[in-house]
Amino acid sequence: MAAESNFVDYVKIYCRSGKGGRGSTHFRREKYIPKGGPDGGDGGRGGHVFLRGNRNYWTLLHLRYDRHIMATNGQSGGAKRSTGANGEDRIIEVPCGTAVYDADTGEFITDITEHGQQVMLLQGGRGGHGNTFFKTATNQAPRYAQPGEPAQERMVIMQLKMLADVGLVGFPNAGKSTLLSVLTAAKPKIANYPFTTLEPNLGIVAYRDKRSFVMADIPGIIEGASSGKGLGLRFLRHIERNALLLFMIPADTDNIAKEYEILSRELVAYNEELAQKRKVLAITKCDLIDEELCEMLREELPTGLPVVFISAVAQQGLEELKDTLWKELSKETLHEPDSIVRQALDLTSLTWDEEDDLFPASIEDDEDEEGLDDIDFDLEIEYDNEGDDAPDQL
């Protein structure tokens, strides 16, 4: 049995904020003042659920084993107008490049792209008012208090779309992993058979004057990948966040122009807005052909596209390639349209593992509060049925 990969780029989790604490119906009790006025405090706020970007995470693996995220409830109000303690917030640490969607509708919720960026996913319920709040000139001994707001809950899908400056695009065995290993310190698996790369790999390319950029090796694309063939849709989404696409086609390919057309068509079929991204074409394995043949090939290539002839094994053309990539990355118009990532998620295209069929966690409350699911926070109150706690007359 193959070992389970540590690269997890999607996960489905259940999240719930804390509900607000109920207000207190307490009445003042002091020596020589057996029947004082109301002094019940407000309930505490329920805990919020936040998302926070963390550059120390590279995958969503840590969430695969912690998929019920629940903040704690606010505490009830107390005597002497004391407010109940707020519920403890839950912060979900995610890698930069994580997009979050509603698991039921596919609606885009938010996008975490920077280290330290924090977004509230679910808001905790407000605490209910104690009976002190309801005291008026005509009602000086209210025997009721307000319950807290109910918790919010949501099933969400998190997808990691790797943040990289340059994404390597090509058919299996195009030499993408070899190029990444030569230009960076990354050590991807390299072998002479298709689909050697089964998960994305990142590496940092050192450039002149201590400058650098991030390169991502995406698993090979085949014709029909946009329909789920090969490794299909799972890894095409990582291309969405690459600022520049480097198409890699071997020099011994029968028809380079046709292969480039197929690759471009698959990307556009997956997401039409990928056509807006800047592209560079690298003809790989050029150590297998002579310069005269290279010039003949150049005449057959698509026009209006930067083309570089390279050989990662023989380290030919690599400096020219880095110059070309940096030049394209430096252009002011190189920006990713927000709509590429922020469009709704097509839930029908997802194939979840059996373990991803989550059910909401059972809710165990510390206190018995009925009817909280249907309350109108602004109107509903709870009466104190214990008449002994209230004064007969003030």
Curated annotation (Swiss-Prot):
Residues 26-45 are annotated as: Disordered. Its EC number is 3.6.5.-. Keywords: Cytoplasm, GTP-binding, Hydrolase, Magnesium, Metal-binding, Nucleotide-binding. The keyword Disulfide bond does not apply. It is an enzyme of class 3 (hydrolase). Residues 164-330 form the OBG-type G domain. Gene3D superfamilies: GTP1/OBG domain, P-loop containing nucleotide triphosphate hydrolases. It is found in: Cytoplasm. Monomer. Belongs to the TRAFAC class OBG-HflX-like GTPase superfamily. OBG GTPase family. This is GTPase Obg. It comes from Porphyromonas gingivalis (strain ATCC BAA-308 / W83). The lineage of its organism: Bacteria, Pseudomonadati, Bacteroidota, Bacteroidia, Bacteroidales. The gene is obg.
